[in-house]
From Swiss-Prot:
The gene is CYBA. Keywords: Cell membrane, Electron transport, Heme, Iron, Isopeptide bond, Membrane, Metal-binding, NADP, Oxidoreductase, Phosphoprotein, Transmembrane, Transmembrane helix, Transport, Ubl conjugation. The modification Phosphothreonine is found at T147. This is Cytochrome b-245 light chain. Component of the phagocyte NADPH oxidase core complex/cytochrome b558 complex, composed of CYBB (heavy chain (beta)) and CYBA (light chain (alpha)). Component of the phagocyte NADPH oxidase complex composed of an obligatory core heterodimer formed by the membrane proteins CYBA and CYBB and the cytosolic regulatory subunits NCF1/p47-phox, NCF2/p67-phox, NCF4/p40-phox and the small GTPase RAC1 or RAC2. Interacts with NCF1 (via SH3 domain). Interacts with SH3PXD2A. Interacts with DUOX1, DUOX2 and TPO. Interacts with NOX4; this interaction mediates superoxide generation. There is a cross-link at K149 (Glycyl lysine isopeptide (Lys-Gly) (interchain with G-Cter in ubiquitin)). It is found in: Cell membrane. Subunit of NADPH oxidase complexes that is required for the NADPH oxidase activity that generates, in various cell types, superoxide from molecular oxygen utilizing NADPH as an electron donor. Subunit of the phagocyte NADPH oxidase complex that mediates the transfer of electrons from cytosolic NADPH to O2 to produce the superoxide anion (O2(-)). In the activated complex, electrons are first transferred from NADPH to flavin adenine dinucleotide (FAD) and subsequently transferred via two heme molecules to molecular oxygen, producing superoxide through an outer-sphere reaction. It comes from Bison bison.
Amino acid sequence: MGQIEWAMWANEQALASGLILITGGIVATAGQFTQWYLGAYSIAAGVLVCLLEYPRGKRSKGSTMERCGQKYLTRVVKLFGPLTRNYYIRAFLHLGLAVPAGFLLATILGTACLAIASGIYLLAAIRGEQWSPIEPKPKERPQIGGTIKQPPSNPPPRPPAEARKKLSEEAAGVPTGGPQENPMPVNDEVV
C-alpha cells in the first residue's frame, strides 16, 4: 500500500478552518458580541490562513490537481521561502492563530478545526514532508516530420482503405473476384 501524504489532508483542513474562522468572526462582529474584537481578529486570522493554504503543494508521487487561480498565490507563498515551506512552522503558526479565537463562542468551531489542521501538519513535518510548488510542465510541441510518415499520393476525395487495397492488388496482377476470361470459345446461337 502507498504511504499517506498528510500535508494534503492538513491543507484541506486548514483551508476549511480558515473559512470557518472568517464566518464565525463575521457573526461575532456583526452581532456585536461583548468581545467583538476577537471576532475581528478571527476574520484577519482566517484571511491569513486562507491566503497561506490556498495554493496546494505538489504531491511526491502522482499528479496534483491545481486549484483555480493558484499560480498567482503560489508566487507569493514561494517568496517567503522556508517560512512557508516548512510544515513545523505552519503547525505552530496555525496553533498560535487558533488560541485567541478560542475564547469566543462564535469562533470556537474554527479554532477546533485549525487546531486539528495544526496537528496534522505536525504529523506531516515529523514524517519529513515539506511544501513544494506545482510547477507548470513545459508543453512538448510535436515535431512536424515525426508525426507524418508519408504524405498521401492522390488528392482527396480518396476511396476507402478497402478499395485502395483492391486497386493495389490489381496493379500487381493478382486475380480478383471480378470477371474472368474464359479459355473455351462460346458460340451463342439464338433460336
